[in-house]
Regions:
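Transmembrane helix exit motif
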Residues: 54-64, 101-127
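Juxtamembrane cytosolic amphipathic helices that cap and anchor the N-termini
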Residues: 130-135
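Single conserved hydrophobic/aromatic residue that forms the stacking wall/gate
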Residues: 210-221
Length: 221
């Protein structure tokens, strides 16, 4: 079963870097393997945080982000995700499973819709109070979603940064990575403090994310 989870997590990482929505694969895989829902959330967040750390470093190295906007969004995202994760701890397994049945298809449709996003930079490079507040709000809202559910977070961030703030896809993707990094670690800390990470599963799955081939390189070239 561990081999199955490693393969599925690796595939989820590949899908996530190509089109977003890797959690649509990894979350059901953990549940199929028999992990209770809260342990599924915690273990999935562990491997996701490791993968996002690597991806964010790549985007930062290539300068494919607006660091000021990304950091502001990350602050909001950390707060929102921490709140969302604590909400998850209050919900029963049955409620969370029902949420998955409803949200998974919706997230999948929105990820497919992302293909029609404009790839045009309309940002003028300045950062005023309005833009700062918008970046914080984007981070807070998407972070809350990531803390409560998760799949599609990166895609929703790209949609927000392109449509609401006018960034091109490359920069929006980088901003989204910073946002998602903060939300992943906020959730991970919450689950770690509550003993909800299965390390003998999460560590091998996280290691596979580092070695999986990634189409991300084409975006950053």
């Amino acid at each position: 079963m561990l081999l199955f989870l490693m393969l599925m997590t690796g595939f989820a990482g590949f899908v996530d870097s190509a089109a977003g929505g890797g959690g649509l694969i990894s979350l059901p895989a953990y549940l199929f393997a028999g992990l209770p829902v809260h342990y599924t959330y915690g273990t999935n967040k562990f491997s996701a945080a490791c993968g996002t750390t690597f991806a964010t470093a790549q985007f930062f190295q290539k300068g494919a982000m607006n660091i000021r906007v990304g950091l502001l969004a990350a602050v909001g995202s950390f707060v929102g995700s921490a709140l969302g994760s604590h909400i998850v701890l209050l919900l029963s397994d049955q409620v969370l499973r029902t949420m998955m049945l409803i949200i998974l298809p919706v997230a999948a449709v929105l990820i497919l819709w992302r293909r029609d996003l404009p790839d045009e930079n309309r940002d003028d490079g300045t950062l005023n109070a309005k833009k700062a507040a918008l970046a914080l709000a984007i981070g807070l809202g998407i972070g809350l979603y990531d803390g409560i559910f998760g799949p599609g977070t990166g895609t929703f961030a790209i949609i927000a940064f392109t449509t609401l703030m006018g960034f091109d896809l490359r920069t929006a993707n980088g901003n989204g990575k910073v946002l998602n990094l903060a939300s992943n670690y906020a959730s991970l800390f919450t689950y770690l403090m509550n003993g909800l990470v299965v390390f003998h599963i999460g560590i091998p799955c996280a290691c596979l994310l580092y070695t999986s081939p990634s189409p991300r390189d084409g975006l950053l070239s």
